[in-house]
Amino acid sequence: MATKFKIKKGDQVMVIAGDDKGKTGEVLQVLPKKEAVIVAGCKMAKKAIKPSEQNKEGGFANAEMPIHISNVKKVEA
């Protein structure tokens, strides 16, 4: 049975655990199978980008990583 989340895309949330504790941001994506959310500006990680036809150089880019749903709480905007 699928878990129903009270947090939806576009909600303002605060991180309550981890390195980004206390930060607030907008939910960009909800990942029900992983029971996680992606929050704008929180839990940033460097991702390697392979060279391709469009991007000959490749390189690195910052990207938001998922945060478990139990580590965020909804706040009023």
UniProtKB/Swiss-Prot annotation:
Pfam families reported in the protein's UniProt record: KOW, ribosomal_L24
Domain of life: Bacteria
Transmembrane segments annotated in the record for this chain: none
GO molecular function: rRNA binding; structural constituent of ribosome
UniProt-listed GO biological process terms: translation
Keyword annotations from UniProtKB, A to Z: Ribonucleoprotein, Ribosomal protein, RNA-binding, rRNA-binding
Listed InterPro entries: KOW, Rib_uL2_dom2, Ribosomal_uL24, Ribosomal_uL24_CS, Ribosomal_uL24_KOW, Translation_prot_SH3-like_sf
GO cellular component, one term: ribosome
Role this protein plays: One of two assembly initiator proteins, it binds directly to the 5'-end of the 23S rRNA, where it nucleates assembly of the 50S subunit.
Similarity section: Belongs to the universal ribosomal protein uL24 family.
Quaternary structure note: Part of the 50S ribosomal subunit.
PANTHER family: MITOCHONDRIAL RIBOSOMAL PROTEIN L24
Name under which the protein is recorded: Large ribosomal subunit protein uL24
Species, as recorded: Sulfurovum sp. (strain NBC37-1)
